[in-house]
């Protein structure tokens, strides 16, 4: 509120100060103040005062007390004037001010006349102005209140207006009176002036006038101020009223309003009184003498009420001045006035002071009032707030009370519920206890019942067994008596037959010498020759059935007859004595010759030498066996091929994997241009053995050739190659012996071929290969269908209506038994179609407008249901081609897999990662894998549907954003590397040494595991570190004697992977005690252990150390019944190791011997004289070394000794062929030392291989020197031969080249091959390759066997025997010690020989078999399948007994031995049980077991080795041959590391009888064909690679792995041979697929599934003599599988039928045909590795390596190729960037651009998607395809394989 001017209290006239007396008395009408005109200022003053007094609406007086109505007043003239209301008055507050200013002159005169002071007037004017302001404010407040519609306020305003009107009337009257008085005064003043113009009077009048004017102006100003103050007060009043109205309550301030009203009225009355006084004074002053009048005037002025009487008096006074006074009176009057004026001035001053005091007091009171009002307002607000809170509090209290009541009730309910719950819980627990008790009682009861039943059954079985035993004993007695009589009666006839066979052997020897010359000429083309030789070697080894085959290991069935083995004629294990005998004779006839290094490279020459060596067949039996072998050259040759592979024949091709990058120009060598630059992870074809400098002769995937440092590469084991076999093959491999043999041979070939082709397994044929799966990566788990289930393609909408759709699709291109289709809509089955229904469907009741619908078609086949997402289509409103549900399916630190739901499965999808284009996802592929990612990195993946260049486009499809979906993901952070697997502690190569082996972790091309770089491995003993190996690929380490003390105190060892970021977790601990016990035991000869039966021992003795198992051919055919069965042999062998664990070689020897026993008889003699034996021998030597190192026992007692023992008598170790200087003990020691040295050297190499080949070579040289210095220097004996055969280089095996081990092995191999060696072994190129490797070990097979089948050799042979062991029970069972020794020897060889194999197999550092001792069966399988060392390329986990793992992560035994061996080793214990292991090896179960237990090497063996195992069966001798051939063709390469295309044994392939032949013969002849076929077959084996054209184009000797080249062998006329029924596993066109020049004329073309007539067994080249379409000719064994027909009627029906459906090929049905799938079932080729080391794991387990992305710019001319196998990069690819590879199914036609890259991959396109395609999974389109020359494409795809073989 604004402060109001303080006014004198009511009834205090003296309180008014002189300044408050306005000059209103001087205002006259003449000045504009007419009667009735209320001066604005005067009117405003009372109004202001009134408003000030009435600050609030309340008043003590009634509303009408002050203003009963409009005030009517009568002016002096009698006119009644109605005063304006307050509202009107306030509208012109400034009117008085302007009016007064207009009358300044008159006011001045009036004031001059009055003489009133300036100061009081100014102050009064100022006070009036303030009042005016207050009035204005009040007016505004009034208006505001009026607007606010406050009725009380409006009423008060009306009252105030009335009061103001009354005051205005009073003021008007006062103004009029003042004017009248003024006029009177002026009239009175004018009268005297005229008569008396006194200058003084004039001056006074002027001064008064001026003073009055000033007073008037001041008074006007004061009035204006008062008006303003009044207005302000009004506004404030209104505000207060509004505020009070808001509060809603009246406060005590209304008491003050009455006071204000009273003060206002008093002030008004005082103003009027003052005005009257002024007027009277003015009247009196002019009249000086009239004092009486002056006194009257004041009295009248003092009248309290301004009434008419007062006005009358004033009028009288006004008229009184008319009296004229005299001069003296004037002066007196003037004086009186002056004195009075002085008094008035003083009085005025006192009044002013009093007014100021009053004003101050008033201000103070106003301040107090304001404070009181503010406080009151605050209290009112506080009160209202507190009242609200009190109300709320009451409400809350009431609610609280109510809630408390509810809470109490709820609490009670809860308590009761808890009590009930507790009671129920207790009851439940009791019931549970009762139930549990009852359950246990029931289980116990059931268990007791089961135990009772079992016990009852067991009792019955025991009783039955007792009866059977009794019967068997009686029958045995009778049979024995009959046999004795029969033998006596037939002795003469047999002698005559022996002489006849000897003659045949001599003739055959001559023929083989010619072949040797031819092969020598072909050595310039080592591939084909190697195939032939290795095939021959493999055949010799592989043909257990042909007992006389020198090349073959001990043959269970000797030439004596089927009696030797109980296997059916068609079974793999069975060999026909006739055929084997001729073959053996032939082999025997061939003189042995030492091979130069080039010769060692040439398997053919080796085989030639084997055949030429008369020693190889020392006995007529051997000659007979050679004759038989002649008939079964294929199988025989196949077997030797594997050993040769081990020996490392020059021409033999192996697949190696570059473990490190190598730039020759940065090395220390003088001729870097002669060396090949290497990139870590790329595949290399290695030809022959390692030279003395530690270099291989190799070829890159792009065709460049040169020297390859051995310590920079590691051999790709057969297991690795076979690990990529198709699932069907894998399954089949486990299913039966024949199948297994097929896998080992054909499969091995396939896998090896696959490896060779680029480390990438080749896809199956179109039927199985669906390109989709390869697009970027295999389908994620749960996504996509199994590879075997075809799916429909190209779904389209034929017609779309409002609520229905007509769909159509294409049937799966694969041959499959369709059982119908399911149509899904949005994942729900909408319609099911039965079989035979057209691929169309009408979907009705579809709401196409509601939104997009996802329609998919699923094929129901005999293989299962296809993946619906592979044939799907989005339709309906909003449907498009954009992929949906893009998500991360699998995420790791370095890889990620994405999946999506394709909008249209017919379209390919481009995949981008961080904006970079990746290989596209082919049509029907909805996943992609990104590899080589950085850990913990954010990536953005984009999948964009690719619109076809031609075809209907929907609007908007041209915009990429409408066709793409994006996804962001962050890779997991890098962690510690993975721990190594399969840690084992095994006896070292010599006493006092323990070998700790493990399976190295899988690393990518950059050498990283789990995102961190692997630097090596640390070995811990009971948690304490004892050793570190600074090699990321090391697979084993030898613990020296100094460290042995530490180990003796510990119980277990663990291995950790080292990296810059720390070490991995501990591996699974391996116990140390057994290894320590064995290592600490002195080496004993297993030969000393109980000897096998004489027959068995004889075969073993027949085995020559150089030959390995090849030299083991049994001199005397051991009939099944007669000879210890493989089981018995295994039993003996197992006994051997148990009794004398230190005799590892004996075990292997036993195995080998047993194996050889059967094959010795058929191939021994020829083998002795030939390189084939040597290759086998090296391999056996390696195995023997392994055994020796493992057992540190009578390793010297080689299988050869065992064979010798078996041959001549029951002596456990008969060194008939070995030099007399080498005694059993010296041989044992030598073998032990050899094994030790070999192992050490190999181990060292493995260690050093990480860094430089030079170091490794140096170490190897040192080791070699050490070996040479050893007391028993096996090297020396073998060195000459091995060097001579291998080419002056003691490189029996690539793995043994530079190492002393290698030299020793070479020397061993150089030792004269025993008669066990079979020429046939070398007839097959693949075998030749293996033989070459073996030659590297003991290439002078003939010489080594002839020189002295030293126990070391026998140990090697034992290894070979192991590999041959599987051949048949007929194998001479090694004594338990022998078997154990062989096992250990195998282990040692696995280490040593394995390394040798590795080296021979082109993996110098790795000991293929080292990781796990290899069974004789393994060796056999390896020898057969891999041709020896080839399998060693990859590290293999220890086999059954856990032989020394590959030191450098390579598998010693398996790779060198080939897959076959690993497979065998899995199934059969490596050494301990000679007979039993042999039997088991021979049996499919054994094979299966081997596969199961083998690591990748084993798996390879399983694929290839299994075939060997099966080939181990003596029945046909073909099993061996087949296995070898199968391998040799491919396996030869496998042996070399690239033999993915090994040919499977005939029986493995489904040709039971082919075994003997398939192993040997097939390898031999097939080498070209087998090579072709094997390669193709290897592909076939691995997945329809069978008709590998490239193989076919390859030289017979081994150039091609497809069809083995045929060696000119004498074959009996087909009319005289038994008729067999075979089925074609692949399409075969001799003209385009065969490497043989006369293929078009001599070989038969056929189609897959075609039924073929086959006469007898396959020849040494791996070819059958058959008939098709009325035409007779040769049929490559690896392209067909035998159909087991039980009855002649069924056979006739089958022949009439002419074809078998694909699904029947792998099935056997009662009397119907039973196909031993060799090519259909084979697993896919080995996993293709791109610049990455492949580990021995299943393809699915291998971590894919980063595939190289190929951009369109790099595309070259395109050509179609056919997928031979199903390929799923996620499952089959070891590379990290599997998304860059295309998944496909067998049979898909893939367009390939340009040439194969260094890693063996093509850049191809399938279904609109592009990516990398492993070459070893492809084959050229068949003749029906009309595309490329079948040979061309296959040759291209299997280029690596062929290279191995060819080169």
UniProtKB/Swiss-Prot annotation:
The organism named in the record is Rattus norvegicus
- Subunit structure, as described in the record: Interacts with RIMS1 and RIMS2. Interacts with TSPO. Interacts with CACNA1A.
Q: What does this protein do?
A: Required for synaptic transmission regulation. It probably controls the recruitement of voltage-gated calcium channels to the presynaptic membrane, and modulates neurotransmitter release.
Protein name, as recorded: Peripheral-type benzodiazepine receptor-associated protein 1
A single GO BP: regulation of neurotransmitter secretion
Q: Which gene encodes it?
A: Tspoap1
Q: Where is the Fibronectin type-III domain?
A: 789-880, 882-974, 979-1077
Q: What residue spans carry the Gly residues bias annotation?
A: 744-757
Entry-linked CDD domains: FN3, SH3_RIM-BP_1, SH3_RIM-BP_2, SH3_RIM-BP_3
């Amino acid at each position: 509120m604004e402060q109001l001017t303080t006014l004198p209290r009511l009834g205090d006239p003296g309180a008014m100060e002189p300044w408050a007396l306005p000059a209103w008395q001087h205002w006259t009408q003449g000045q504009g103040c007419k009667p009735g005109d209320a001066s604005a200022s005067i009117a405003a003053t009372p109004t202001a005062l009134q408003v000030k007094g009435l600050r609030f609406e309340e008043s003590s007086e009634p509303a009408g007390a002050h203003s009963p109505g409009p005030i009517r007043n009568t002016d002096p003239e009698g006119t009644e004037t109605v005063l304006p209301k307050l509202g009107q008055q306030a509208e012109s507050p400034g009117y008085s001010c302007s009016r007064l200013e207009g009358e300044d002159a008159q006011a001045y005169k009036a004031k001059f006349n009055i003489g009133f002071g300036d100061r009081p007037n100014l102050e009064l004017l100022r006070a009036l102005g303030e009042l005016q302001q207050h009035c204005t404010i009040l007016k505004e407040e009034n208006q505001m209140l009026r607007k606010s519609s406050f009725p009380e306020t409006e009423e008060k305003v009306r009252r105030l207006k009335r009061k103001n009107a009354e005051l205005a009337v009073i003021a008007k009257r006062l103004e009029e009176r003042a004017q009248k008085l003024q006029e009177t005064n002026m009239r009175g003043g004018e009268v005297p002036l005229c008569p008396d113009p006194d200058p003084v009077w004039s001056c006074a009048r002027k001064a008064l006038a001026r003073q009055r004017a000033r007073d008037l102006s001041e008074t006007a100003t004061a009035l204006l101020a008062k008006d303003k103050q009044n207005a302000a007060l009004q506004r404030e009043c209104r505000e207060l009223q509004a505020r009070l109205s808001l509060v809603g309550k009246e406060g005590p301030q209304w008491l003050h309003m009455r006071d204000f009203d009273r003060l206002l009225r008093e002030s008004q009355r005082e103003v009027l009184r003052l005005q009257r006084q002024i007027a009277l004074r003015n009247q009196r002053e002019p009249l000086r003498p009239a004092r009486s009048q002056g006194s009257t005037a004041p009295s009248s002025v003092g009248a309290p009420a301004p009434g008419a009487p007062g006005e009358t008096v004033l009028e009288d006074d006004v008229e009184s001045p008319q009296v004229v006074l005299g001069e003296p009176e004037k002066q007196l009057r003037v004086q009186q006035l002056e004195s009075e004026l002085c008094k008035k001035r003083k009085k005025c001053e006192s009044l002013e002071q009093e007014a100021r005091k009053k004003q101050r007091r008033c201000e103070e009171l106003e301040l107090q009032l304001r404070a009181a009002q503010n406080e009151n307002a605050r209290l009112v607000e506080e009160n209202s707030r507190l009242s609200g809170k009190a109300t709320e509090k009451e409400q809350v209290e009431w609610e609280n009370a109510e809630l408390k009541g509810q809470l109490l009730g709820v609490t009670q309910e809860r308590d009761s519920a808890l009590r009930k719950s507790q009671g129920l819980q207790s009851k439940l627990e009791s019931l549970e206890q009762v139930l549990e008790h009852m359950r246990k009682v029931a289980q116990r009861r059931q268990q007791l019942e089961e135990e009772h039943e079992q016990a009852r059954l067991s009792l019955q079985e025991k009783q039955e067994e007792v009866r059977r035993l009794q019967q068997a004993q009686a029958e045995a007695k009778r049979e024995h008596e009959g046999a004795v009589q029969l033998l006596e009666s037939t002795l003469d006839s047999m002698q005559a037959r022996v002489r006849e066979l000897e003659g045949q052997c001599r003739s055959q020897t001559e023929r083989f010498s010619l072949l040797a010359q031819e092969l020598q000429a072909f050595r310039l083309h080592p591939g084909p020759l190697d195939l032939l030789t290795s095939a021959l070697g493999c055949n010799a080894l592989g043909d257990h059935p042909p007992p006389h085959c020198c090349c073959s290991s001990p043959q269970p069935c000797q030439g004596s007859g089927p009696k030797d083995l109980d296997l059916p004629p068609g079974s793999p294990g069975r060999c026909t004595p006739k055929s084997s005998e001729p073959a053996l004779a032939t082999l025997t006839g061939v003189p042995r010759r030492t091979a130069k290094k080039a010769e060692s490279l040439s398997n053919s020459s080796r085989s030639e030498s084997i055949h030429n060596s008369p020693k190889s067949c020392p006995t007529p039996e051997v000659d007979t066996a050679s004759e038989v072998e002649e008939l079964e050259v294929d199988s025989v040759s196949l077997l030797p091929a594997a050993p040769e592979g081990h020996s490392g024949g020059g021409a033999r091709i192996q697949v190696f994997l570059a473990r490190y990058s190598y730039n020759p120009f940065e090395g220390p060598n003088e001729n870097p241009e002669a060396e090949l630059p290497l990139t870590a992870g790329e595949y290399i074809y290695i030809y022959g053995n390692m030279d003395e400098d530690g270099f291989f002769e190799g070829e890159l995937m792009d065709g460049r050739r040169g020297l390859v440092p051995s310590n920079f590469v590691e051999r790709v084991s057969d297991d690795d190659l076979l690990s990529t076999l198709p699932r069907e093959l894998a399954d089949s491999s486990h299913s039966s012996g024949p199948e297994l043999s097929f896998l080992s041979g054909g499969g091995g070939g396939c896998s090896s071929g696959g490896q060779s082709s680029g480390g990438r397994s080749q896809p199956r044929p179109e039927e199985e290969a669906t390109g989709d799966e390869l697009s970027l990566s295999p389908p994620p788990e749960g996504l996509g269908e199994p590879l075997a289930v075809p799916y429909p393609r190209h779904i389209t909408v034929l017609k779309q209506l409002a609520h229905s759709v007509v769909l159509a699709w294409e049937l799966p291109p694969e041959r499959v038994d369709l059982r119908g289709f399911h149509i899904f809509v949005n994942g729900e089955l909408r319609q099911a179609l039965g079989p035979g229904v057209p691929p169309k469907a009408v979907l009705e009741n579809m709401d196409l407008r509601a939104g997009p619908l996802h329609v998919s078609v699923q094929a129901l086949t005999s293989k299962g249901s296809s993946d619906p997402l592979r044939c799907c289509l989005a339709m309906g409103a909003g449907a498009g081609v954009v992929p949906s549900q893009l998500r991360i399916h699998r995420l790791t630190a370095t890889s990620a897999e994405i999946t999506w739901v394709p909008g249209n499965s017919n379209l390919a999808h481009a995949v981008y990662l961080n904006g970079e284009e990746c290989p596209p996802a082919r049509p029907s592929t909805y996943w992609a894998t990104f590899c080589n990612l950085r850990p913990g990195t954010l990536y953005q993946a984009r999948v964009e549907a690719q619109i076809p260049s031609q075809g209907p486009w929907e609007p908007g499809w041209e915009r990429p954003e409408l066709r793409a979906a994006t996804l962001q993901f962050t890779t997991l952070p890098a962690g510690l590397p993975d721990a190594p697997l399969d840690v084992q502690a095994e006896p070292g190569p010599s006493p006092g040494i323990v070998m700790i082996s493990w399976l190295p972790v899988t690393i990518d091309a950059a050498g990283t595991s789990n995102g961190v770089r692997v630097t090596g491995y640390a070995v811990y003993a009971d948690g304490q570190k004892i050793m570190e190996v600074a090699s990321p690929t090391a697979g084993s380490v030898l613990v020296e004697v100094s460290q042995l003390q530490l180990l003796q105190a510990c119980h277990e060892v663990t291995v950790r992977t080292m990296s810059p970021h720390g070490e991995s977790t501990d591996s699974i601990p391996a116990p140390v005690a057994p290894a320590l016990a064995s290592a600490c035991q002195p080496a004993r000869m297993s030969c000393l252990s109980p000897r096998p039966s004489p027959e068995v021992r004889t075969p073993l003795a027949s085995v020559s150390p150089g030959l390995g198992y090849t030299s083991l051919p049994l001199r005397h055919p051991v009939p099944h019944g007669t000879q210890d069965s493989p089981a018995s042999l295994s039993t003996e062998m197992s006994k051997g190791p148990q009794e004398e664990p230190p005799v590892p070689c004996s075990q292997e020897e036993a195995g080998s011997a047993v194996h050889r026993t059967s094959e010795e008889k058929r191939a021994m003699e020829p083998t002795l004289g030939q390189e084939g034996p040597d290759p086998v021998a090296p391999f056996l030597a390696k195995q023997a070394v392994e055994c020796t190192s493992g057992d540190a026992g009578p390793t010297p007692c080689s299988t050869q000794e065992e064979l010798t023992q078996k041959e001549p008598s029951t002596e456990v170790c008969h060194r008939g062929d070995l030099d007399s200087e080498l005694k059993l003990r010296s041989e044992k020691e030598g073998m032990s030392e050899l094994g030790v040295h070999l192992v050490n050297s190999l181990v060292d190499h493995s260690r050093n291989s990480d860094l430089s080949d030079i170091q490794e070579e140096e170490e190897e040289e040192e080791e070699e020197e050490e070996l040479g210095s050893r007391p028993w220097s096996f090297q020396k004996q073998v060195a000459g031969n091995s060097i001579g055969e291998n080419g002056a280089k003691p490189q029996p095996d690539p793995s043994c080249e530079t190492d002393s081990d290698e030299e020793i092995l070479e020397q061993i191999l150089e030792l004269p091959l025993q008669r066990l060696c079979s020429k046939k072994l070398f007839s097959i190129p693949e075998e030749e390759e293996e033989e070459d490797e073996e030659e590297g070990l003991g290439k002078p097979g003939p010489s080594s066997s002839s020189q002295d089948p030293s126990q070391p050799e026998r140990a090697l042979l034992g290894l070979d025997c192991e590999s041959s062991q599987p051949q048949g029970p007929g194998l001479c069972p090694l004594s338990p010690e022998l078997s154990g020794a062989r096992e250990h020897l195998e282990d040692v060889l696995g280490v040593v020989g394995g390394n040798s194999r590795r080296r021979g197999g082109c993996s110098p550092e790795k000991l293929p078999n080292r990781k796990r001792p290899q069974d004789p069966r393994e060796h056999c399988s390896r020898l057969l399948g891999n041709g020896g060392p080839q399998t060693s390329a990859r590290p293999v986990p220890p086999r059954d007994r856990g032989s020394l793992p590959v030191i450098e992560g390579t598998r010693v035994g398996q790779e060198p031995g080939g897959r076959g061996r690993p497979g065998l080793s899995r199934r059969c214990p490596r050494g301990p049980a000679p007979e039993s292991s042999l039997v088991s090896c021979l049996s499919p179960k054994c094979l299966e077991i081997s596969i199961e237990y083998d690591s990748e090497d084993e798996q390879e063996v399983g694929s290839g080795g299994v075939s060997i195992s099966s080939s181990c069966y003596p029945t046909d001798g073909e099993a061996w041959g087949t296995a070898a051939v199968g391998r040799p063709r491919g396996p030869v390469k496998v042996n070399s590391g690239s033999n993915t295309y090994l040919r499977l044994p005939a029986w493995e392939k489904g040709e039971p009888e082919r075994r003997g032949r398939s192993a040997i013969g097939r390898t031999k002849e097939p080498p070209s064909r087998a090579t072709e076929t094997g390669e193709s077959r290897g592909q076939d084996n691995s997945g329809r690679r069978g008709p590998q054209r490239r193989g076919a184009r390859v030289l017979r000797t081994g150039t091609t792995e497809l069809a083995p080249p045929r060696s000119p062998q004498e074959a009996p006329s087909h009319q005289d041979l038994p008729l067999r029924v075979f089925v074609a596993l692949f399409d075969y066109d001799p003209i385009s697929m065969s490497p043989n020049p006369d293929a078009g004329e001599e070989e038969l073309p056929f189609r897959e599934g075609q039924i073929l007539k086959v006469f007898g067994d396959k020849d040494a080249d791996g070819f059958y003599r058959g008939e098709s379409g009325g035409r007779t000719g040769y049929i490559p064994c690896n392209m067909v599988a035998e159909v087991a027909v039980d009855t002649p009627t069924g056979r006739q029906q089958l022949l009439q039928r002419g074809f078998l459906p694909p699904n029947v090929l792998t099935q056997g049905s009662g009397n119907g045909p039973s196909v031993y799938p060799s090519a259909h079932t084979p697993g896919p080729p080995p996993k293709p590795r791109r610049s990455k080391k492949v580990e021995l794991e299943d393809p699915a387990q291998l971590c894919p390596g980063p595939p190289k992305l190929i951009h369109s710019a790099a595309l070259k001319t395109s050509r179609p190729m056919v997928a031979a196998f199903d390929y799923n990069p996620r499952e089959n690819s070891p590379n990290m960037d599997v998304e860059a590879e295309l998944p496909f199914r067998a049979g898909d036609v893939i367009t390939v651009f340009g040439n194969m890259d260094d890693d063996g991959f093509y850049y191809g396109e399938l279904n609109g998607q592009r990516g990398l395609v492993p070459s070893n999974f492809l084959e050229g389109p068949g003749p029906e395809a009309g595309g490329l020359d079948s040979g061309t494409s296959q040759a291209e795809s299997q280029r690596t394989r062929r290279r191995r073989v060819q080169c």
